[in-house]
């Protein structure tokens, strides 16, 4: 007998539709104003660091696609108990990374690229484990692309260097607000 699930089909269609529409309008359904401002600053950092508008756009587009897909999976109740524990671990690790990034930004001479890069790599690995059975290999590649880009020690060193002070300040302001509001 053929196995058919309209819920599964609807979820596939939703993910497919969202993957085609990872622009600003769809992102605002899942990403609040503060998060959007942080993403805009991350885009500017990537653009200035890589000297490539298309590369910076690709990273942010991949980040938004992944965030939206994970949000859809979570809101649709697709994660089992073990996966929900992984989701909690991911959120805790992401929060730890945000607090570390803030600390490095606020306290002079404390920045260590290896520490922040390590936290981002841990986040990547937890997220990949979380979505292993729910997203396609292409989405897994997007996750790797985003986290590998932002965990690059050279990019992190540039971000915490004198040329990116303004961007870092805005990113830290956004992270602080997200942490204070319990959104991160």
UniProtKB/Swiss-Prot annotation:
Similarity comment text for this entry: Belongs to the TNFAIP8 family. TNFAIP8L2 subfamily.
Tissue-by-tissue expression: Expressed in thymus, spleen, lymph node and small intestine, but not in liver, heart, muscle, testis, spinal cord or brain. Up-regulated in the spinal cord of mice with experimental autoimmune encephalomyelitis. Constitutively expressed by macrophages, B and T-lymphocytes at various developmental stages.
InterPro entries: TNFAIP8-like, TNFAIP8_sf
Gene: Tnfaip8l2
Superkingdom as given in the UniProt entry: Eukaryota
Protein name listed in UniProt: Tumor necrosis factor alpha-induced protein 8-like protein 2
Function, as annotated: Acts as a negative regulator of innate and adaptive immunity by maintaining immune homeostasis. Plays a regulatory role in the Toll-like signaling pathway by determining the strength of LPS-induced signaling and gene expression. Inhibits TCR-mediated T-cell activation and negatively regulate T-cell function to prevent hyperresponsiveness. Also inhibits autolysosome formation via negatively modulating MTOR activation by interacting with RAC1 and promoting the disassociation of the RAC1-MTOR complex.
GO BP term, pick one: negative regulation of T cell activation
Quaternary organization: May interact with CASP8; however, such result is unclear since could not reproduce the interaction with CASP8. Interacts with RAC1.
């Amino acid at each position: 007998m053929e196995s058919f699930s309209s819920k599964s089909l609807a979820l596939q269609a939703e993910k497919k539709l969202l993957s085609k529409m990872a622009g600003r309008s769809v992102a605002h359904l899942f990403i609040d104003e503060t998060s959007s401002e942080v993403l805009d600053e991350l885009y500017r950092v990537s653009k200035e660091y890589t000297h490539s508008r298309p590369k910076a756009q690709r990273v942010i587009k991949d980040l938004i696609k992944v965030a939206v897909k994970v949000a859809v999976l979570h809101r649709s109740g697709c994660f089992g108990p073990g996966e929900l524990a992984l989701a909690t671990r991911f959120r805790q690790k992401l929060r730890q990374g945000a607090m570390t990034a803030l600390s490095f930004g606020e306290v002079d001479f404390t920045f260590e690229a290896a520490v922040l890069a390590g936290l981002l790599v841990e986040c990547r690995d937890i997220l990949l484990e979380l979505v292993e059975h729910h997203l396609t290999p292409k989405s897994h590649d997007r996750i790797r692309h985003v986290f590998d880009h932002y965990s690059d020690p050279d990019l992190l060193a540039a971000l915490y260097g004198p040329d990116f002070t303004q961007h870092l300040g805005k990113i830290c302001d956004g992270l602080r607000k997200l942490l204070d509001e319990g959104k991160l």
